[in-house]
Amino acid sequence: MRLPGAMPALALKGELLLLSLLLLLEPQISQGLVVTPPGPELVLNVSSTFVLTCSGSAPVVWERMSQEPPQEMAKAQDGTFSSVLTLTNLTGLDTGEYFCTHNDSRGLETDERKRLYIFVPDPTVGFLPNDAEELFIFLTEITEITIPCRVTDPQLVVTLHEKKGDVALPVPYDHQRGFSGIFEDRSYICKTTIGDREVDSDAYYVYRLQVSSINVSVNAVQTVVRQGENITLMCIVIGNEVVNFEWTYPRKESGRLVEPVTDFLLDMPYHIRSILHIPSAELEDSGTYTCNVTESVNDHQDEKAINITVVESGYVRLLGEVGTLQFAELHRSRTLQVVFEAYPPPTVLWFKDNRTLGDSSAGEIALSTRNVSETRYVSELTLVRVKVAEAGHYTMRAFHEDAEVQLSFQLQINVPVRVLELSESHPDSGEQTVRCRGRGMPQPNIIWSACRDLKRCPRELPPTLLGNSSEEESQLETNVTYWEEEQEFEVVSTLRLQHVDRPLSVRCTLRNAVGQDTQEVIVVPHSLPFKVVVISAILALVVLTIISLIILIMLWQKKPRYEIRWKVIESVSSDGHEYIYVDPMQLPYDSTWELPRDQLVLGRTLGSGAFGQVVEATAHGLSHSQATMKVAVKMLKSTARSSEKQALMSELKIMSHLGPHLNVVNLLGACTKGGPIYIITEYCRYGDLVDYLHRNKHTFLQHHSDKRRPPSAELYSNALPVGLPLPSHVSLTGESDGGYMDMSKDESVDYVPMLDMKGDVKYADIESSNYMAPYDNYVPSAPERTCRATLINESPVLSYMDLVGFSYQVANGMEFLASKNCVHRDLAARNVLICEGKLVKICDFGLARDIMRDSNYISKGSTFLPLKWMAPESIFNSLYTTLSDVWSFGILLWEIFTLGGTPYPELPMNEQFYNAIKRGYRMAQPAHASDEIYEIMQKCWEEKFEIRPPFSQLVLLLERLLGEGYKKKYQQVDEEFLRSDHPAILRSQARLPGFHGLRSPLDTSSVLYTAVQPNEGDNDYIIPLPDPKPEVADEGPLEGSPSLASSTLNEVNTSSTISCDSPLEPQDEPEPEPQLELQVEPEPELEQLPDSGCPAPRAEAEDSFL
């Protein structure tokens, strides 16, 4: 009910008098409480004054929020007690519960209470304030709770919302209590409208506590402490959020309390720790320390105890017994062990013959002391490959400031017995004497035995022991000597035999506790000549020599010979099952490629293999626009056979036959007259693709791990991202040159000896390329400078688009080789070189690599094959086609998008690998490869090679994944290459003067499918393999490929020059990179590279550098 609010003072005073009079006159009817006005709910006006009266048969009192506000208590004459509570100047904060209860318990029900709820609508107070405890509601199970957002006006409409939501929740509301229901672990607020103003309550947090069975663990920093040191114990509870710790300890029983500290382990959820720290421990603090943990919700409890020992001072005590005499066997490792207890941790020293031992004896002595428990230690002295000189008196001493103990023993070195001499002599007395001399430690015993039937002895007939017996007519004489320096015994025994009438096998056996040794000698009668023994020995040596020569000849014949991997297909049989390859020696060689030797200045060795080497050189007069040009020169070693010289000449003819292409290491010239054959090619200073990916992996990972990278970061930016350090191209070995590796450690790494020269070749210490410098720090020398238009990408950061670009460029180069009917047969990332501006070139690096020591090449018969990169038909049927190169291209893609990983890392190179390939096993998607890239890999790895996509289709598939900026830049570089006076372009134009303009796309219908013609020359080039037309997968309309432009020559020749080594300058046309979710995989092992001028290719190819 609503009562009038403010009343005049006189009226209030009169009312109080009247009320008191009524109370005095009213008879005592019951002992119950009477509240005036009766309630149970009142609505009062703000700023008004109101009186509440409570009466009863015992003293009564008004309570408000568990407190007794100021009130007037009285007792009437009839024994009735009353309490008057006057509320003045009411505000909204006076809203709430008021209780009237008895003030004592004189036989009355102590729990009898009268409740009255008063509302004071106050526009300035929307919601009643709550204590901090009321804002956090904790639950241990799913149950109904109340969110106490109470208002001062019962007429207000109140709604409940999640803290970050606008939708009202359908929960019943009580103006006196709040919202009641089952709530989730969320944050909630209440809203109401007062006038035209929306009012929000404080946020209420509902939180469900983790309550489970208590699991307590107690540990101490040290269970043994000295008097005066600190005792620190930790009690940890797992699986609960609110628990109570109670410690019991010896000091507590004597009334000396220690306040423990409780904290939460933030890095381990639901882990609470209580720490008991007792400073300056006394002897009385020894005893049991117990941690009792209780949880009040489910009344769970658990306790653990630990014993603490306080000692007056430290101690060292030996455990167990160690004999005073120890043994060690010569040349065997021996570990001497001493176990002891100590506190505090002691210092341990070992002595030999009163000299301190250490770990500095070249690895022959190892000392170690380890702590096996808190106070238990094991000290070990390990003698590695024991020597006689290590015998002696040893002492172990353990000590600290409070105590000391030592243990001594004698070490005896046991030496296995060995027969040093067994000889026979014929004294003049007619008897025959056999003398046996041997040594060992401990003292050896000597046993003589003999066997008369040489054919059946000793396997069928046991030897007869000899001694002082009349039957054998033999006598023994034995002398024993101890050698102090060697610390071993020497035994000399002489056996005297009488009347030896036929050959006799005499055996001398020495035996001691370590082992035994035996030698035999044939004692022959005096009449038998000793020349028989000498002749037998000579014949045996002759036989061994002949067998050794045969083995060496067989090994020499099986030694792999250098052969070029690239093959050019001439024709295919009508049934498509036989291929005839072009005999490279029948190809013409144009003298246009010839370069005078005096225009070539050779420098340091870049790479060296089993058959040849590649050196850095400076060529003069190759280009009109450049007086000098840095080049790579391939040559054979002086030990090369004629077949290998023929193979190198065949490689030269194939390269000149193929012609130039932007993504192939191009032939620049050759020296074939007046000395060894030199093949001069382009010089790629950043080395092979595998090494490049390894050295720049950190820039890729940093670049893509930053999720906050601004979208304005672009593909062709010349600046590093903010906060990204300059790339640190780490060299993996001591020396490196130009990105090429010296594959033979015993070869010279300085300068190439000019063999068979006429004196017309110049030598120079060519300045090594600074391959370790980042892109933006590299300043090329004059011969290397080129225009900025020839750079595809200048960014020093390795990006995802770079990986796609590398794949695209390799596909372009392989498309060119396929158009020339050329099969690569060793396509891998190690045979792809990186030039300036992230331009890649396909090569064959076998000449400068020792394939017999390269783990990527597996011996199969008399050759070494890169099995992990080979297609199934190549492995099992020796079938090589351009479509088997497509399989290898898929493996190369996997290498690129694993940042230089080794294929099939989970498969050993044994029968398991072959079985997995036969079953159709394929590698999983690399972490950095998109689904589109992995789909291309899977197409390349089709079991049936007929349905693998040709390289022309792979170019189009990869082109779709590139940005327009990249494609335009690549086309610009390609066109610039064709218009330049690059030596490969000029010499090809001179060789084909009538060939101008762009070549039309390859018409595969007229290539490779002619009838087989008889070939009397080289049957070695015929490999039976089917190579029908590939079935092109059904793809959508594809854009034209720009790669064909690189396979043609343009008659327009400008003054610009293309070089693989070029300075880097900013570019204007950026391309945004795709967003990647980067997953870092374990980094594969990197091979070591020699330090040189530029990154070295990995030693992983079989054949030619080109």
Swiss-Prot record:
This is Platelet-derived growth factor receptor beta. The record marks S527, L528 as: Breakpoint for insertion to form PDE4DIP-PDGFRB fusion protein. GO terms for cellular component: apical plasma membrane; cytoplasm; cytoplasmic vesicle; focal adhesion; Golgi apparatus; intracellular membrane-bounded organelle; lysosomal lumen; membrane. The record marks K558, K559 as: Breakpoint for translocation to form the CEP85L-PDGFRB fusion protein. The active site is at D826 (proton acceptor). PROSITE patterns: IG_LIKE (PS50835), PROTEIN_KINASE_ATP (PS00107), PROTEIN_KINASE_DOM (PS50011), PROTEIN_KINASE_TYR (PS00109), RECEPTOR_TYR_KIN_III (PS00240). Gene3D superfamilies: Immunoglobulins, Phosphorylase Kinase, domain 1, Transferase(Phosphotransferase) domain 1. Residues 1019-1106 are annotated as: Disordered. It is a single-pass type I membrane protein. Residues 1043-1060 have a biased composition (Polar residues). Keywords: ATP-binding, Cell membrane, Chemotaxis, Chromosomal rearrangement, Cytoplasmic vesicle, Developmental protein, Disease variant, Disulfide bond, Glycoprotein, Immunoglobulin domain, Kinase, Lysosome, Membrane, Nucleotide-binding, Phosphoprotein, Proto-oncogene, Receptor, Repeat, Signal, Transferase, Transmembrane, Transmembrane helix, Tyrosine-protein kinase, Ubl conjugation. It comes from Homo sapiens (Human). One of its GO terms (molecular function) is platelet-derived growth factor binding. Changing Y589H: In a gastric adenocarcinoma sample; somatic mutation.
